């Protein structure tokens, strides 16, 4: 994806710089008596004219912000164009924001992605906090993410994972892109729950590759700090070409969502649902509510087709690639650490045996596998920087003044590598989470701010429970079902572990592996 590098924009901004400084000082940017009596703003680096600190972020902003935290402390301030940005880079500071001031930071700041991709804020992820947002979240919880819904859909998850494993067992002599295989599984599983049927063949095919490319492109675009969002005078220029790419990508997604809806309207039925009956999948429920003109929230707002498309877009993007990329990172780490892989396989053999695949009922009896998942989330959080939040009112955090309208970013990646919280933070050591160890009671569900891959507070990921079950079941089944060798004779010590930054944390080089079945043939159903 070609995005214009920020430093190349500076030559055309010289005049703007002079104007910006003039306006700044005319407005009293140097402060007055009242300002001097208030709490100080958090410290931070000096920025460029007009663009502020945007050019200093580099191609991996979470790395840059981690380094800045070492220099300025766990709470520091940046300026993105006209926007004040505060970054939380430690568990105690994150807790003050996301627990102590959660209500004040319950909204998102305006951004191009929400406008041009997410149906102008009509989705769940970027919708303003309020009755409509709560109603959308309740719908998802009731039909997908509640304990009852998760239990009802257990057979769907286990069935799709079994199909993935069967397909891999047939390819044991071939090199496979593990992330792609995991993405097909995650997408088909979610599709059966949301629209009632698979969207890809089990072996993926061209459609699956195209869809993954679309999701990766969306996450890359969403991870770009778009100059137009922070310098309003330059918005119309779209100097990085980000908005134009977003609009093109939105049209592709919109065609996809329209296809799902039109197919259902034309009478196509979900798997296992008789003609003329509504299915229990989310799309059936939403279309029924729309046709019956049921109210979406207490304000009398009714659900629209655009609402449905926006919600499906959230689910098919946030709920697929995050899962598959985490599974890919987990297997990469296990291949690099064969002793950890063998320990996990020994536990699985003891609990499950070699005559069947893992089921979800096995997972609570697999403490070492659970530790592997937690350690993978720690080193490779799917969202390294939290989605931004906005201060509704001025507040005080850690002795500093946080101005009204400031954007909050939580560096999830840096917090999970904080040496004051995690001994040997750069080492992959699942044993740190085992019973009797220092982090035995840490979970990933938002209560322990040292490990928040799904976020925390009222804007925590709505699909946390689904995502955690999928990542754990997929990883457990792959570890149990196969021994793994790297493709093309590569050795584990040479495995590329570089990151490719986006809104989600991708591998720079896809993991190419050869699966070698290790269970009884009957376990695979082949």
From Swiss-Prot:
<comment type="function">
    <text>Catalyzes the 3'-hydroxylation of the flavonoid B-ring to the 3',4'-hydroxylated state. Catalyzes the 3'-hydroxylation of apigenin to generate luteolin.</text>
</comment>
<keyword id="KW-0521">NADP</keyword>
<keyword id="KW-0479">Metal-binding</keyword>
<keyword id="KW-1133">Transmembrane helix</keyword>
<keyword id="KW-0812">Transmembrane</keyword>
<dbReference type="Pfam" id="PF00067">
    <property type="entry name" value="p450"/>
</dbReference>
<dbReference type="InterPro" id="IPR036396">
    <property type="entry name" value="Cyt_P450_sf"/>
</dbReference>
<keyword id="KW-0408">Iron</keyword>
<feature type="transmembrane region" description="Helical">
    <location>
        <begin position="6"/>
        <end position="26"/>
    </location>
</feature>
<dbReference type="GO" id="GO:0016020">
    <property type="term" value="C:membrane"/>
</dbReference>
<dbReference type="InterPro" id="IPR017972">
    <property type="entry name" value="Cyt_P450_CS"/>
</dbReference>
<dbReference type="GO" id="GO:0009813">
    <property type="term" value="P:flavonoid biosynthetic process"/>
</dbReference>
<comment type="similarity">
    <text>Belongs to the cytochrome P450 family.</text>
</comment>
<dbReference type="GO" id="GO:0016711">
    <property type="term" value="F:flavonoid 3'-monooxygenase activity"/>
</dbReference>
<dbReference type="InterPro" id="IPR001128">
    <property type="entry name" value="Cyt_P450"/>
</dbReference>
<dbReference type="GO" id="GO:0005506">
    <property type="term" value="F:iron ion binding"/>
</dbReference>
<dbReference type="GO" id="GO:0020037">
    <property type="term" value="F:heme binding"/>
</dbReference>
<comment type="pathway">
    <text>Secondary metabolite biosynthesis; flavonoid biosynthesis.</text>
</comment>
<keyword id="KW-0560">Oxidoreductase</keyword>
<protein>
    <recommendedName>
        <fullName>Flavonoid 3'-monooxygenase CYP75B3</fullName>
        <ecNumber>1.14.14.82</ecNumber>
    </recommendedName>
</protein>
<keyword id="KW-0472">Membrane</keyword>
<dbReference type="InterPro" id="IPR002401">
    <property type="entry name" value="Cyt_P450_E_grp-I"/>
</dbReference>
<feature type="binding site" description="axial binding residue">
    <location>
        <position position="461"/>
    </location>
    <ligand>
        <name>heme</name>
    </ligand>
</feature>
<keyword id="KW-0284">Flavonoid biosynthesis</keyword>
<keyword id="KW-0349">Heme</keyword>
<keyword id="KW-0503">Monooxygenase</keyword>
């Amino acid at each position: 994806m070609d995005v214009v590098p920020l430093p190349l924009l500076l030559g055309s901004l010289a005049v703007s710089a002079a104007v910006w400084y003039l306006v700044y000082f005319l407005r009293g940017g140097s402060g007055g008596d009242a300002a001097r009596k208030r709490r100080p703003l958090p410290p931070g680096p000096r920025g460029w004219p007009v663009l502020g600190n945007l050019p200093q972020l580099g191609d991996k902003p979470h790395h840059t912000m981690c380094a800045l935290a070492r220099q300025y402390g766990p709470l520091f301030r940046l300026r993105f164009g006209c926007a004040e940005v505060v970054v939380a880079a430690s568990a105690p500071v994150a807790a003050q924001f996301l627990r102590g001031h959660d209500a004040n930071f319950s909204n998102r700041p305006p951004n191009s992605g929400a406008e041009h991709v997410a149906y102008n804020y009509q989705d769940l992820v970027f919708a303003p906090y309020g009755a409509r947002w709560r109603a959308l979240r309740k719908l998802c919880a009731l039909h997908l993410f509640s304990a009852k819904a998760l239990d009802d859909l257990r057979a769907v998850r286990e069935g799709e994972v079994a199909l993935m494993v069967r397909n891999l067992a047939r390819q044991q002599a071939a090199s496979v892109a593990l992330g792609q295989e995991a993405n097909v599984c995650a997408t088909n599983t979610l599709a059966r729950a949301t629209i009632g049927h698979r969207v890809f063949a089990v072996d993926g095919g061209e459609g699956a590759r195209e869809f993954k490319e679309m999701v990766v492109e969306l996450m890359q675009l969403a991870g770009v700090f778009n100059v137009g969002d922070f310098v309003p005078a330059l918005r119309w220029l779209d100097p990085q070409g980000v908005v134009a790419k977003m609009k093109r990508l939105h049209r592709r997604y919109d065609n996809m969502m329209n296809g799902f809806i039109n197919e259902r309207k034309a009478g196509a039925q979900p798997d296992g649902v008789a003609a003329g009956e509504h299915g229990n999948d989310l799309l059936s429920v939403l279309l029924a509510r729309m046709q019956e003109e049921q109210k979406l929230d207490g304000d009398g707002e009714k659900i629209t087709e655009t609402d449905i498309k926006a919600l499906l877009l959230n689910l098919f993007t946030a709920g697929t690639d995050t899962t598959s990329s985490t599974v890919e990172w987990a297997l990469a780490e296990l291949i690099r650490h064969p002793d950890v892989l063998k320990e996990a396989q020994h536990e699985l053999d003891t609990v499950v045996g070699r005559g069947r695949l893992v089921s979800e009922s096995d997972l609570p009896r697999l403490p070492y596998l659970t530790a592997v998942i937690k350690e993978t989330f720690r080193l490779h959080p799917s969202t390294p920087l939290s989605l931004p939040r906005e201060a509704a009112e001025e507040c005080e955090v850690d002795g500093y003044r946080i101005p009204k309208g400031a954007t909050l970013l939580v560096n999830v990646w840096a917090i999970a590598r904080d040496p004051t919280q995690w001994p040997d933070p750069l080492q992959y050591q699942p044993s740190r989470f085992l019973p009797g160890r220092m982090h035995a009671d840490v979970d990933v569900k938002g209560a322990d701010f040292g490990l928040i891959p799904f976020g925390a507070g009222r804007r925590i990921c709505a699909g946390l429970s689904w995502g955690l079950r999928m990542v754990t079941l997929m990883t457990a089944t792959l570890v149990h079902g196969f021994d793994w060798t790297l493709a093309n004779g590569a050795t584990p010590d040479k495995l590329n572990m570089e990151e490719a930054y986006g809104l989600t944390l991708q591998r720079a080089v896809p993991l190419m592996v050869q699966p070698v079945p290790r269970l009884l043939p009957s376990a695979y159903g082949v």
